[in-house]
Amino acid sequence: MSLYESVQNQIKESFVFISNEYSDDLLQRVLRPDRVMEFHIPVKMDDGTTKVFAAYRSQHNNAKGPYKGGLRFHQNVSKDEVMSLSAWMSLKTSVVGIPLGGGKGGIIVDPKLLSKGELERLSRGFAAKLTPFIGKEVDVPAPDVNTTGEIMAWMVDEYSKLVGVWTPGVITGKPLSIGGSQGREKATSLGGCFTIDEYFKNSGQSLAGKTIAIQGAGNVGLNFATLIVHNYGAKVVAISDSRGGIYNPDGLDVDQIEKLKSENKSVSEYSNASQISNDDLLLLNVDILVPSALEQVIHADNADKIQAKVILELANGPVTPQADKILTSKNIPVLPDVLANAGGVTVSYFEQVQNNTNYYRPESEVNEKLEAIMRPATLAAIQTAEKYNTTLRNGAYIVSLRRILEAMKVRG
C-alpha cells in the first residue's frame, strides 16, 4: 500500500462517522488532490555542466483558503510523498481552524552534495517554475526537510522579481529581517506542549513529573524538551538523534543537551546517562513517547512492545495504520500529527497575516495567540473522539473533515 493510499484510508475511516451529513461526491473530491505538478529544473553547476533536477508541488484542497505547505529538498522526494503530505496539510490547517488549505512540494536532491551557489540557483529555479502557480492568495509554500529561512529568502526574492513587486506573504518561514514571524522557530514544539498539557488537564492531571522519551533531537524535539521541562516541570528521561540516544530514569539535563547540539555534537556524548538505540527508546516505559523525527517508526513489528501511556506525534506520520490498530487495542492513546504538530503552520499563518497587513507582533503575543488556537483544537478532538467512541486520530480527522466538507458544500 502506498503512503497516499494509507492517507486515503484514514480519511475514509473518519468519514464513516459523518457520512449521514455529507455526500460521497464530496468525499471523493477530498480523496484526490486538486492538482499535482511535476517540474524539471536545469541548474548550471560550478564545474560548468548543467544538471536537471525533478521537482513536485501538490495542491490538495483550497476550500477553506490558499494551499499551504512546505517544500523539502531530499533524495527520497516522490510524487506519492508530496500528495500524501499535502492531504495531511489540508487536515492540519482545518483541525486548528485557520483559513488555509493544504499543499506540499519538493525537489529530488541531496542538498549536502551541492555548493551554496548551486543550492541558491536550484532554489531560484524552483521559485521561477512555481511562480505561475503560487501567490499570497493562491498557494503559500514554507520550509520543510532540508530547507531553511535562507532558501525561503532566495525564493521570495526570485518570485518578487518575476512578478515585479515585493511580495513577502507568498512564502513563510523567512528570516525576521525580511518579514519572518517572531516565535516561528519554536512554534511546532510549543504547540505540542499546549496539546499534551491540554490532554492531561482534560483528565484532571498535570505534566509535572511526567516522564518523557523523545525520538529526535532536531529543532522540534530539542525545543520541545526544553519547553516541557522548564515550563511544565516534566522529566525528559531519554532523547536521541541520528547517531543514537541516551537514557537516565532520573532525568536528563536538557540545557546541557541543547549546548551539545549547538556545538554540532551528538546527544550520545552526554556523560550522565546510558546509551540507547533509537529503536529501544521507543519501547521505554514512560508516561509520554514523542516521535519527533522520522515517518513510520512505530509499525506492526514494534507496536505491541510500546509501553508509553500516551504518544504525541510531533513528526509527520510516525505511526503506521497497522500500528495504530495495535495501539488502540492496547488502550494507548495517540495525539495525532495533524493536531500535535500544527503549531508550526499556525504561526506560519500568523506570518502571512503580518506580511499582508504590514503589522508585526512581538513573540509574547504570537505565543498567546498560538495557545488560544491549540488548546481549543485539542479539546475539540478529545470531545469528538469521546462523542463517537473512537480514537483521538479519528476525533481530529472528524473535526477537520467536517470543516472542509462544509466549506465545499456551501461553495457548491
Each model region followed by its residue ranges:
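Glycine-rich, N-terminal phosphate-binding loop and its surrounding beta-alpha-beta segment
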Residues: 38-111
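Glycine-rich phosphate/diphosphate-binding loop of Rossmann-like nucleotide-binding domains
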Residues: 174-175, 180-286
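Rossmann-like adenosine-cofactor binding region
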Residues: 244-334
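Short, Gly/Pro- and small/polar-rich lid/capping loops
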Residues: 2-40
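Adenosine-phosphate binding glycine-rich loop
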Residues: 2, 199, 308-412
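Glycine/serine-rich phosphate-binding loop and adjoining beta1-alpha1 elements at the start
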Residues: 93-208
